[in-house]
Regions:
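Flexible mid-to-C-terminal extensions adjoining Fe-S/redox cofactors in radical SAM and related proteins
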Residues: 3-7, 348-441
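Short cysteine clusters
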Residues: 97, 101-104, 326-329, 344, ...
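Canonical Radical SAM [4Fe-4S] cluster-binding loop centered on the CxxxCxxC motif
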Residues: 83-84, 88-119
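N-terminal [4Fe-4S]-dependent radical SAM core
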Residues: 3-31, 50-90, 134
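Radical SAM/AdoMet-radical enzyme domain recognition
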Residues: 121-144, 151-274
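Radical SAM enzyme [4Fe-4S]-AdoMet core and its adjacent flexible, acidic
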Residues: 1, 211-223, 230-329, 334, ...
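A broadly conserved sequence feature marking short terminus-proximal activation segments
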Residues: 51-70, 336-372
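Conserved, mostly hydrophobic/aromatic
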Residues: 97, 101, 143, 200, ...
Length: 441
């Protein structure tokens, strides 16, 4: 039996007077005392006698943490970039929006720039070409913005164009949309008949929702959004809910969870703390305190579980073993209304300072092709967690993978905190998942 420092990486986490011993590459969680924690540490450093003592102490359980062959785990390792030939794309059809959310991470609706039709078809054609060249029978298109509802005729026309190309090439397109739910009944019916899935933004009871998510004239949006959610449920449409939590609403997360579970059939609800970017940075809305978010998330999670639902948060995902937080680290293809290619949904404005990091090309209307800055794209592939010194001893390392790169870079540019608030949230909620894995929740 051999213990390899990388493949047998172990994290020791204090818990109620004992220690959680976590072996991410072995999908193993043990609970032990300080002596056992020290013994595992010695074994992991190559102490042969410690290995034998572990065998005597743990018996068969020792096999769970032993690694006999290198590469025996399923870590999603980011490779060097190959040619840019995406078979999935996110189309930001417009910067316009049918809401003026006070905490918007962008400035939705401030600009009405909309993607020209020849760009819509050109990008779609390139994705089909890439799928055909790769011998794929499927590809994926996500519609985003702004909000597609602000340019509804273009949204419908783009979906119709996809369907025409599907029929002629025999390549199936999976479609999804991020929507604020501000739709009329005809739009709701069309969406559920023509789009495969959606993420719907709802912040909870009307009074909470309408405190931040308002129409351009300042009036409430909850009436329209609730009707959209009701229609989704009536036709058994596949969708998830995303709720943004602010300092003003964090103490009501339990209530929000109960409302959403009582009024929606969505199986998965995601709650995220507001982040001060875009319009949010200049508004009265404030991000919640990290510990307060954690405490109230735990209450809301119990409510959701009682309804048979899953409450999630992006930085706590024990079921994901990876060295990158998301596809923004090189794999993503998001085309903005102006034709820029960004890897990050949250960085879609060329004037954003982070555009220098996440923008890596443009759609060329003359050649109807992608012009890519390979040096910038290669730098995106240099964002994995292994390149982040502050993460190396953290037990969340292979799950949050250094956290959302846009938020991390924004925080690093705005603050010198050693422990950003999201790190605290990530650690506490991931610790909860480890405790649950021990059966001691």
């Amino acid at each position: 039996m051999r213990f390899k420092p990388l493949l047998m990486e172990v994290f020791t986490i204090p818990h109620q007077g004992q220690h959680i011993l976590y072996f991410p590459f072995r999908h193993t969680v043990l609970l032990g005392n300080a002596a056992l924690a020290n013994l595992v540490g010695q074994a992991n450093r190559g102490d042969v006698s410690a290995v034998q003592r572990l065998r005597e102490t743990l018996g068969d359980k020792c096999d769970d943490i032993a690694v006999d062959e290198p590469g025996e785990h399923h870590l999603c390792v980011r490779q060097q970039p190959g040619p840019f030939k995406p078979t999935r794309v996110s189309l930001f059809l417009t910067e316009d929006c049918t809401l003026r959310c006070r905490y918007c991470y962008a400035h939705g609706g401030k600009s009405r720039e909309t993607m020209p039709w020849d760009m819509v078809t050109g990008v779609i054609d390139r994705i089909f070409d890439n799928a055909a060249a790769a011998g794929r029978k499927t590809m994926a298109v996500n519609f985003h913005g702004g909000d597609p509802g602000a340019v509804w005729p273009l949204f419908v026309r783009a979906r119709d164009y996809l369907r025409d190309r599907e029929g002629s090439l025999g390549i199936h397109v999976t479609t999804s949309v991020g929507t604020n739910g501000v739709l009329d009944q005809a739009q709701r019916l069309w969406l559920t008949q023509n789009i495969d899935s959606a993420t719907l933004s709802v912040d909870g009871p009307p009074a909470i929702h309408d405190s931040h998510r308002i129409l351009p004239d300042g009036s409430p949006s909850s009436g329209l959004v609730m009707k959209t959610m009701e229609h989704f449920d009536q036709v058994k449409f596949r969708y998830g809910i995303r709720s943004t939590i602010t300092a003003e609403t964090v103490s009501r997360m339990e209530e929000i969870a109960h409302f959403l579970c009582s009024n929606s059939a969505a199986k998965r609800i995601q709650m995220e703390p507001m982040f001060p970017r875009g319009r949010a940075a200049g508004s009265d809305s404030r991000a919640p305190e990290a510990q307060e978010f954690v405490d109230n998330f735990r209450k809301a999670r119990k409510v959701a579980a009682g309804f048979g639902r899953t409450l999630s948060y992006s930085g706590a995902r024990l079921d994901v073993l990876t060295n990158v937080f998301c596809k923004a680290c090189g794999d993503s293809a998001v085309v903005t209304p102006s034709g820029d290619i960004t890897s990050c949904y949250e960085v879609a404005d060329a004037k954003d300072p982070l555009a220098q990091v996440f923008f890596f090309g443009r759609y060329d209307s003359e050649t109807r092709s992608f012009a890519v800055d390979e040096q910038r794209r290669a730098r995106l592939f240099g964002l994995p967690v292994l390149d982040k010194p502050r993460c190396q001893d953290c037990f969340c390392k292979w799950h949050c993978a250094g956290d959302c790169p846009a938020k991390v870079l924004h925080a690093e540019g705005a603050s010198t905190q050693d422990l950003p608030d999201r790190c605290l949230i990530n650690r506490e909620l991931t610790r909860d998942q480890l405790v649950a894995a021990l059966g001691k929740d």
